[in-house]
Amino acid sequence: MCIRDRHTVTERSPSLIPMETEERWVSRAAGLDLRNVSMKLMCGGKAVYEDFGELLFTAYGVGGPTILSASAHIPAMEPGKYSVVIDLKPALSEKQLDARILRDFGERKGMRFADSLRGLLPAQLAPVVAELSGIPADKKVDEVTKEQRRELGRLLKGLTVHIRGFRPVEEAIITRGGVSVKEINPNTMESRLCPGLYFAGEIIDCDGYTGGFNLQIAFATAYSAALAVSQA
């Protein structure tokens, strides 16, 4: 009763959670764990979060460490409001990537375009990118135009998926929200408003990214609260 009547409590919501996408092609790449890719979480044409690392394609959308961290930057999920732009070749500029593609095509003259991408992309993703590029799969690589090649490069640097929503809350690593930290003594975790009331873990409006930070918050707040209670 004291919590509800006197404390400021932010509504609970899932965080560090995989996302579902509008695009169905992701299911064809399900299970593919991309490493060393860059991603941007976009909202209204602006990047609200950027990250580099691992990204996982799933049967329903996207997951993995970068996506889980990105989910923490979505205060309220609205279908169609957010998108994720993936740079599959972040180490290369568009010019460098175009030179790489041109070199690969030169080494594979007479090969089908769709087959030529297997040296550039994971086998599971290559046919998807080939289809998204709009270049006919059976077209010989030496027949691909300069503009088509550059469009392919732009696709590789900006593969975009549109977010439909979060996965079920049961799949979230944590929930965010809870009792305001301003109303809790950080040394003892005791309520500043209700003496004798202590808080720990996810009931507090305090959370972090993946990587053990939330476990540390839980352990540290629980230890502080238990120590304070034992000495009260």
Roles of regions detected by a PLM:
Residues 6-12, 158, 166:
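Short, compositionally biased leader-like segments
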Residues 21-22, 175, 227:
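Short Asp/Glu-rich motifs
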Residues 63-66, 179-180, 203, 210-214:
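Gly/Ser/Thr-rich beta-alpha loop segments that engage phosphate groups in nucleotides
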